[in-house]
Amino acid sequence: MPILQVELLKGRTVEQKREMVRKVTDAITGTLNCPKEAVRIVIREMEFENFAKAGVLKVDTK
């Protein structure tokens, strides 16, 4: 049973997440030859103040 963890910054719509999990599930089932029902996806959303790149918080880079 494949279990995928996806970490995203907050701000995606439910529709975008639906499309993402559908496409990721299709990619996994096609690659690993397993049924859709076996695929699990966990989406974790981060606040901008909890993510940094090059020493700068995302909240400070608008």
What are these regions (language model features)?
Residues P2-K62:
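A domain-level signal for the structural core that forms small-molecule/cofactor-binding pockets
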